[in-house]
Protein backbone atom coordinates (compact mmCIF):
# COMPACT_ATOMS: atom_id res chain seq x y z
CA UNK A 1 0.00 0.00 0.00
CA UNK A 2 1.13 3.53 -0.70
CA UNK A 3 1.36 6.33 1.84
CA UNK A 4 -1.73 8.24 0.73
CA UNK A 5 -1.83 10.72 3.60
CA UNK A 6 -0.74 13.70 1.46
CA UNK A 7 -3.88 15.55 0.41
CA UNK A 8 -3.43 18.32 -2.12
CA UNK A 9 -5.76 21.24 -2.61
CA UNK A 10 -6.65 23.68 -5.34
CA UNK A 11 -8.46 27.00 -5.22
CA UNK A 12 -11.95 26.90 -6.70
CA UNK A 13 -11.11 30.04 -8.69
CA UNK A 14 -8.73 27.99 -10.88
CA UNK A 15 -11.81 26.43 -12.52
CA UNK A 16 -12.61 29.20 -14.99
CA UNK A 17 -14.57 27.61 -17.86
CA UNK A 18 -18.06 28.98 -17.19
CA UNK A 19 -19.59 26.37 -19.50
CA UNK A 20 -18.08 23.40 -17.65
CA UNK A 21 -20.07 21.14 -15.31
CA UNK A 22 -17.31 21.69 -12.72
CA UNK A 23 -17.72 25.47 -12.73
CA UNK A 24 -21.50 25.30 -12.61
CA UNK A 25 -21.64 22.71 -9.83
CA UNK A 26 -19.32 24.74 -7.60
CA UNK A 27 -21.07 28.03 -8.43
CA UNK A 28 -24.50 26.54 -7.71
CA UNK A 29 -23.78 24.43 -4.63
CA UNK A 30 -20.39 25.46 -3.27
CA UNK A 31 -19.60 27.53 -0.22
CA UNK A 32 -16.52 27.85 1.93
CA UNK A 33 -16.62 26.59 5.51
CA UNK A 34 -14.80 28.42 8.32
CA UNK A 35 -11.59 26.51 7.54
CA UNK A 36 -11.54 27.37 3.83
CA UNK A 37 -12.76 24.02 2.47
CA UNK A 38 -15.43 24.26 -0.22
CA UNK A 39 -18.50 22.33 0.90
CA UNK A 40 -21.94 21.32 -0.37
CA UNK A 41 -24.90 20.55 1.87
CA UNK A 42 -25.10 17.01 3.22
CA UNK A 43 -28.26 15.01 2.74
CA UNK A 44 -29.51 14.63 6.30
CA UNK A 45 -32.61 12.73 5.14
CA UNK A 46 -30.34 10.11 3.55
CA UNK A 47 -28.12 9.78 6.60
CA UNK A 48 -25.28 12.04 5.47
CA UNK A 49 -24.95 14.06 8.65
CA UNK A 50 -21.93 16.10 7.56
CA UNK A 51 -21.61 18.43 4.58
CA UNK A 52 -19.75 17.13 1.55
CA UNK A 53 -16.22 18.28 0.84
CA UNK A 54 -15.80 19.35 -2.78
CA UNK A 55 -13.03 17.14 -4.17
CA UNK A 56 -11.17 16.00 -7.27
CA UNK A 57 -10.26 12.35 -7.84
CA UNK A 58 -8.59 10.30 -10.55
CA UNK A 59 -10.87 8.80 -13.21
CA UNK A 60 -10.53 5.33 -11.60
CA UNK A 61 -13.13 6.46 -9.04
CA UNK A 62 -15.56 7.90 -11.59
CA UNK A 63 -15.89 10.91 -13.85
CA UNK A 64 -19.43 12.22 -13.32
CA UNK A 65 -19.48 15.60 -11.59
CA UNK A 66 -21.78 15.36 -8.57
CA UNK A 67 -20.88 11.75 -7.73
CA UNK A 68 -20.67 11.28 -3.96
CA UNK A 69 -18.19 9.27 -1.92
CA UNK A 70 -17.77 8.07 1.64
CA UNK A 71 -14.04 8.23 2.39
CA UNK A 72 -12.47 6.49 5.38
CA UNK A 73 -8.90 6.93 6.63
CA UNK A 74 -6.73 4.46 8.53
CA UNK A 75 -7.04 6.72 11.59
CA UNK A 76 -10.80 6.09 11.67
CA UNK A 77 -11.86 9.41 10.20
CA UNK A 78 -14.87 9.29 7.88
CA UNK A 79 -15.76 12.17 5.59
CA UNK A 80 -17.98 12.63 2.58
CA UNK A 81 -16.88 14.07 -0.75
CA UNK A 82 -18.64 15.17 -3.89
CA UNK A 83 -16.75 15.03 -7.20
CA UNK A 84 -16.37 18.58 -8.50
CA UNK A 85 -13.29 18.20 -10.67
CA UNK A 86 -11.25 15.48 -12.32
CA UNK A 87 -7.53 14.88 -11.97
CA UNK A 88 -5.95 14.77 -15.43
CA UNK A 89 -5.16 11.16 -16.39
CA UNK A 90 -1.76 12.41 -17.60
CA UNK A 91 -0.96 13.46 -14.02
CA UNK A 92 -1.94 10.18 -12.33
CA UNK A 93 -0.54 6.66 -12.10
CA UNK A 94 -1.39 3.96 -14.68
CA UNK A 95 -4.69 3.07 -12.96
CA UNK A 96 -5.58 6.78 -12.57
CA UNK A 97 -5.95 6.56 -8.78
CA UNK A 98 -3.32 9.01 -7.51
CA UNK A 99 -0.76 11.60 -8.62
CA UNK A 100 3.03 11.67 -8.24
CA UNK A 101 3.02 12.49 -4.51
CA UNK A 102 0.54 9.64 -3.85
CA UNK A 103 -2.32 12.07 -3.29
CA UNK A 104 -5.61 10.32 -3.90
CA UNK A 105 -8.02 13.05 -2.78
CA UNK A 106 -7.57 16.68 -3.81
CA UNK A 107 -9.68 19.23 -1.94
CA UNK A 108 -11.25 22.26 -3.57
CA UNK A 109 -10.73 25.24 -1.28
CA UNK A 110 -10.96 28.99 -0.93
CA UNK A 111 -7.29 29.83 -0.34
CA UNK A 112 -8.26 33.23 1.09
CA UNK A 113 -10.01 31.40 3.95
CA UNK A 114 -7.82 28.28 4.16
CA UNK A 115 -6.33 27.55 7.58
CA UNK A 116 -2.67 28.51 7.77
CA UNK A 117 -1.33 25.07 8.79
CA UNK A 118 -2.79 23.52 5.62
CA UNK A 119 -1.23 26.29 3.50
CA UNK A 120 2.12 25.97 5.27
CA UNK A 121 2.30 22.17 4.93
CA UNK A 122 0.77 22.08 1.44
CA UNK A 123 -1.51 19.22 2.52
CA UNK A 124 -4.97 18.98 4.05
CA UNK A 125 -3.73 15.98 6.05
CA UNK A 126 -2.73 18.31 8.92
CA UNK A 127 -6.43 19.17 9.39
CA UNK A 128 -7.38 16.50 11.92
CA UNK A 129 -10.84 15.52 10.54
CA UNK A 130 -9.09 14.57 7.26
CA UNK A 131 -5.95 13.04 8.79
CA UNK A 132 -4.66 9.60 7.79
CA UNK A 133 -3.99 7.36 4.82
CA UNK A 134 -6.99 6.70 2.59
CA UNK A 135 -8.30 3.27 3.65
CA UNK A 136 -11.40 3.19 1.44
CA UNK A 137 -13.37 5.25 -1.06
CA UNK A 138 -16.94 4.05 -1.44
CA UNK A 139 -19.10 5.48 -4.20
CA UNK A 140 -22.55 6.36 -2.85
CA UNK A 141 -25.35 5.40 -5.18
CA UNK A 142 -27.94 8.11 -4.71
CA UNK A 143 -27.93 11.22 -6.86
CA UNK A 144 -27.15 14.50 -5.13
CA UNK A 145 -30.14 16.82 -5.18
CA UNK A 146 -28.69 19.91 -3.54
CA UNK A 147 -29.26 18.65 -0.01
CA UNK A 148 -32.95 19.49 -0.10
Model-identified regions with their sequence ranges:
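Solvent-exposed, well-ordered loop and adjacent helix/strand elements within mature globular domains
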Residues: 1-148
Amino acid sequence: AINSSFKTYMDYRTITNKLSPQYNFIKTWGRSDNNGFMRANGERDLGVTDDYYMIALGSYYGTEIGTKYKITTDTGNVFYGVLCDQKDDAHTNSTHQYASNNDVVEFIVDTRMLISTVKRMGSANVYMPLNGNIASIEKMDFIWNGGE
